[in-house]
Structure formats: structure tokens, C-alpha cells
Amino acid sequence: MSQTKTEEPMSHRQILEALSGLLLVLFVAMVSSTIVSTALPKIIGALNGTQSQYTWVVTATLLTATASTPIWGKLADLYNKKLLVQISIVVFVVGSILAGLAQNAGELIAARAFQGIGVGGLQALVQVVIAAMIPPRERGRYNGYLGGVMAVATVGGPLLGGVIVDTSWLGWRWCFFVGVPIAVIALFVLQKTLHIATLRRDNVKIDYLGASLIAAGVSVLLIWVSFVDGSFAWLSWQTFAMVGAGLVLLALAVWVEARTAEPVVPLDIVRQRTTALSIIASLSVGMAMFGGAVFLGQYFQIGRGYTPTEAGLLTIPMMAGVLGASIVVGRLITRSGNIKPYIVAGTVILVLGFAALATIDHQTSLVYVGAAMFLVGVGVGSSMQNLVLAVQNTVPLKDIGAASSTIAFFRSLGGTIGVSVLGAVLARRVTDNITHALAAAGVPAGSGGGASNLNLNALPPAVQHIVRAAYGDATGHIFLISAGIALVGVLAAALMRPTALRSTLDLAAPAEKVPVTTR
């Protein structure tokens, strides 16, 4: 049995006040995942870390955030959503402080893993709380702000990291400290402004076994994705062992979820057409969001020779596209009540943007690159958050948490896998390009002065040019692959059922049968 402690509907002003706190904490949570991308060389150097530890500083946060996302979502369906958001903020703040105080790479990795638990909670719960505050019909315009913040955080994180490490009086530790005061402010803002109904359910049972199996299965697969093609080959016993173990654990999780009263991921929701197709589309959008930020930054720094700060500034067209599309499309959805046309259009624009980026090399006009990045941004901004909205519109309020976190989970998973796979393709392509260019220049193999070294200043000028050209030319190839994968998102969006957004927080209750009495 369940009881709901009702609250008066929040006014537009009250929603904006609460939304300010939610967006603040979501911003710092997502920035924490991307800010280290340009700062890591200095961080690992200062802590005397290894290449393996370099990878794990990023992987640890991504791993715990992705694995914990569906668990946070299910908890939101069972317990006080406001309290869970506040707990996530506290976990994030503690993890950030510990990371900033780390004295060696091992301590930093452990702190980042703990921080990731808070990040996973905030990524899932912010969307759940918004769904509990605002009916789907009105949610579009507010989701526009949410999508814009997520995009700015993802693309702007590397820029902020570059500025911090390039500023002598700050230092790399502020990459972790910078979000702490903002998160604390958001905590107090939410305590004062967030007022949503509290669902109280009797005899609640958490599916700990299912949650553990999901976390373990996803963790094994993400660890494999992080190390494949670097520590071992794609076709190796390590690959078969890790992929096999991950799939077995996830298969067991499905078996458990199908038989428990309170599954972490309700399978009846996942089997719904809208949810299933949104999951597929979210995988492609996730790769666009994360892959674009990672590899475009590398393209500008290595392929074109710009500094970390300059590379961050050059990604502004993509940031502007995401932010503008998120806000404009959100308002159009609220006005029309239809969501499918905008998701389809967004995924098509995403394909066009990637197709344009597939033609770039180390000499391509920055105006052309900027225009292509803007298209990618518009595609992401038109589809990313609206896929969550489409799912939220088709499930009852009691399942909003699980449904929203499922989409967020697959978006993060798609981004993780996409970055790893595209990174492996890029590395192989760069190696081939460098080898052929050195041979064409008459430089014997093994005498290129360490051409694979990313510290280009340590290379002879002629070899520097070869390495830059190799990276610049290879980057277009991986975006061609991205365009092909984004086509899957177009197909998934096109197959979604057109559904008008409902104007109530919850689905209409089925009509109760009138008892018939006999005399």
C-alpha cells in the first residue's frame, strides 16, 4: 500500500527557483567528468602516476556513475526524491574534496570512484525531480534548460580545465575544488525551494541482488572497453573472458528482475515500444555528446596545434548549437504538444553534422569545421533530453525514476563505448598515417624521434608536422563511423509512435469497476 503526501502545485516562479538549484548541481556534476580531460597530463605528472593510472582517473568516475544510475532511479521511485538529491550532493562534495586533497594517483582514483556515485545520482535524480514537479506538456521548455546545461557542461568542461591548469595561481587541484562551493549553494537552494509530493510506500523491498548483478555486469563491460586494444587485443582470451562474464551477469540480472516484486529496471517498461526505441536512439546520441567533446578537443590540440584553452574556445559553435536547440525546441514542443517530429529532425541533423565532420583534415577551414560542429550541436540539443521526455510521457509517476534513469544509463553507456571504440580506431589510423608519412619522407622506421609521443614539443619540427597531419586527417575517419551509427538513431526515432504530451503529472487511473450487489 502507498500513501502520497500531497503538495500544492508549484507556480512558474517556484519551479524556476527550484530549477536553478537543480541545474547548478547538475552542471558541476557533469563538469567534474569532463574537466580533467585537458588537465590530466599535469595532474598525473604531479602525482608521479603511470599511463594505466591516467586512464583510471577518468574511468573510475564513469564506471561508478554509469553503474549506479539505475539504482538511484529505482530508489527515487521508493523514497523521498528531495532527500536522495541532497544525499547525492553530499556524496559528490565529499568525493570532490578528497580528490583535490589526493597525495598520489591511487588516492585520486579512489576519490574519483566515490565522486562518481554522487555524479550518477545527480544525473538520474535531477530529471526524476523535474518529472515529479512538471506535467509532460509543460516539461518541454524546462527540459530545454536542462539539455543546454548538460551540453555546456560536457563541452565547456575541457575549456575550464585548460584555463585552470594554465593559471599558475590556481593549480590542478582546483579542477576538483571548483565545483564544491557551487554544489553547497545548490544544496541550500533546494532545501528552501524544492517542494514535491512525497510517495510513502509500505513494505518496500529493495532488489539488492538485481542491483548488484547490474552494477557488476556493467562494470566488467566498462573495464573491458577501457582496456581493449591498449592492454590486450580485441580478439584475445581477455576479451572473451570479460565480455562473457559481463553478459552472463547481465543475463542473470534480467532473470532476477523478471521475478522480483520491485525490480531496479522494470522489464515491462523496457519492453514498451517508446522506451525500447528511445534506448537505441540514446546510445547514438550519447556517442555524439561524449565523442564530439573528446575527439574534437584532441583534433584542435594535436591536429591543429592550439592550446587547451584555445581548443575549448573553438568548440563554442557546438555548445551554441546544443544550447540554442535545447531551448527553442523545448518551447516548440510545449506549444505543439508533439515530440516525435523534433526528435526525428534532431537525429537527421546529427547525421548531417557528422557527415560534414567526416570530410575534415588538418588543413580544413575553421569556418567549415565550426559550421559542422554547430549542426552536431543542434542535433544533440533537439534529441537528447526529448528522448527522456518521450519515455516519461508514457509511464506512470511511480515508475518515472526507473524509466528516466534507464535512458540516462544507456546514454552514458553509449558514450563510454563510443569513446573507447572510436579512440581505438583513431589510434590505429594515426599509427598507419605516421608510418606511411615517415616512409614517404625517407625517415627510417624507429628513427622518428618518438613520433607516437603526444608531447609534440619534444619532436623535431619535421616530425611534428607529420604527427599533426596524421591526427588531423584521421579524425575525419572516426566521424564517418559516427555518422553511420547516428543513422540507427534516425531509424529508431522514425519508428516511435507519435503521442501527444499529457497535461497531468500521472497517467489517468483505470476506471474502477462498480460493485454489483445482490439482494
PLM-predicted stretches and their roles:
Residues 166-281, 288, 348, 468-473, ...:
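Hydrophobic transmembrane-helix bundles of small-molecule transporters
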Residues 29, 58-61, 65, 92, ...:
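Structural signature of transmembrane alpha-helices in multi-pass secondary transporters
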Residues 1-22, 255, 453-519:
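Transmembrane-helix exit segments and adjacent C-terminal regions of multi-pass membrane proteins
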